[in-house]
């Protein structure tokens, strides 16, 4: 029996970091050593980039888009993009517009995969199960649930992503720095 192939692309971020008193870069694909895929599934890893998403700039996004456009999607059941959570929704929205009909799921984590209570493995499993289901709902985000990439808001102070109630409506700039809104944000281990 031929195995179903899923391409997993590492870009860095917390999902590819190591736990400790601070979160530091480690290996973009180390989660593949911790995750057991379903029977009949072969995860093919490519460490394309290694940076925290908060350091993404225009040049990086151009490189990422070029890389993602160069993938032969027909060779895989789907593609998982491991990404940092800080700019996850921005990159996801960009890729949703660039690759609207591709089987692509962006996956992030609140803490490194080996940290106690990390959502890294469950988020990866959600992405794999979604791709195996054959659903064709466009680019998705797997982070404590499945979210449409084009209509997901930035994480709130408790690291939860939400669906935008009215996507693509311009909003007024905040007058606050946001600090008052995020007093309850937990510190990362």
Label each region the model flagged:
Residues 2-189:
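Active-site histidine-anchored catalytic micro-motif
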